[in-house]
Amino acid sequence: MQHALGFGGKLEMHGKSETKLGIGVIGCGNISMTYLRNAALFGGVELRACADISADMAELRASEYGIRAIGVDTLLADPDIDLVLNLTIPAAHFDISLSALSAGKHVFTEKPLATSAADGRRLVAEAAKRGLLIGSAPDTFLGAAGRRARRLMDDGAIGKPVTGTAFMMGRGMEHWHPNPQFYYQPGGGPVFDMGPYYLTMLVNLLGPVERVMAMATRGQEERLITADGPFKNTTLKVGTPTNIVSLLEFRSGATVTFGASWDVFKHSNHPIELHGTEGSLRLPDPDTFGGTVSLSERGADWVDFASDSELYGARNWPYSAPDRANYRMLGVADLAGALATGRKPRASGELALHVLEIMEAILASGESRGSVAVNGTVDQPPLLGEEEAATLLA
């Protein structure tokens, strides 16, 4: 093990740099490009190697970012790697993260933490047992819009939260993704794929969920792949619900309707709205780091808070023609800061586990048509203040 960590003390790293967390990326597919590109923004992390089930893909990413392409086992044994960034497909998240923890590495994984809450609990327990940190996407709630919304909520801008809505609706993945099959199998679907952005933001703003009720259906049993690629004009069988309506009861007493559907052509619902005893708050798409947060105090006109000029809110993606803020890697940088100072990371495994338990409860309720308790709980992550957010930059 390359690390000695106690939450009362600071991390010791024995790698190339005593001040940077050495990152080894496993999984070099679509999402990896964002993380690899954004790594240079942050001072506490350093890319060192990458691996993929496809050696060619690993070599491509390595050549693009000036790092080594090596095998998975070699990466896990490499003393220069302090943290494994797990960007594999959801079905592989548990095995790769457990292997990394077993090798003495800290872990940050793409969402979901695992495809079952039982596996998620095992990962969180394994990290704790070994004195390692595990973090998980999404980290979008740490972006400019998420921080603004959290400050407003903490300041009592809407009073006591009473109710709200959250909607993720679209036509699914087969229209743009060349290999969309895994999105439509257990562990995929709109709740597991997109739900983490919405649910993580809601837990960040309202605290933990206590109980859910849901209905779940499939708009189609088969779907036609129209995206360019090897599977264009072929069909895939749907193995998980694609249209889910749920009611979330938070431990605070607030209730939120959460709808997630890949069976919608067009809609006009706002991504998230929260309503309290003193006003209402409207949030942008929680899959991005920026966008406009709007506040109405006691029925007054909406007051907009744009994010473009704020840290981790400026539009930077896609790089050729930016139309949204994408600072994936921010959660990894926050975890590096946690290791350096002895605090807990904000985009933590515990937070991701609670979100995973909520999602599992939603799908279970969708099957049983009864209410399902969310037995686990988590503390709201502490607000990422503006000064601390700036210290994460290179």
Question: PLM features: what roles do these ranges have?
Answer:
Residues 2-65, 393:
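N-terminal Rossmann-like dinucleotide-binding module
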Residues 6-8, 221-239, 245, 250, ...:
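C-terminal glycine/acidic-rich active-site capping loop/insertion
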Residues 13, 83, 89-141, 156:
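Beta-strand-loop-alpha-helix segment that lines the small-molecule cofactor/substrate pocket
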Residues 45-47, 81, 161, 209:
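Core-facing hydrophobic residues within beta-strands of well-ordered domains
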Residues 68-77:
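Short acidic low-complexity segments
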Residues 80, 88-89, 260:
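Short glycine-/small-residue-rich Rossmann-like dinucleotide-binding loops
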Residues 140-237, 369:
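Predominantly a Rossmann-like dinucleotide-binding segment in NAD(P)-dependent oxidoreductases
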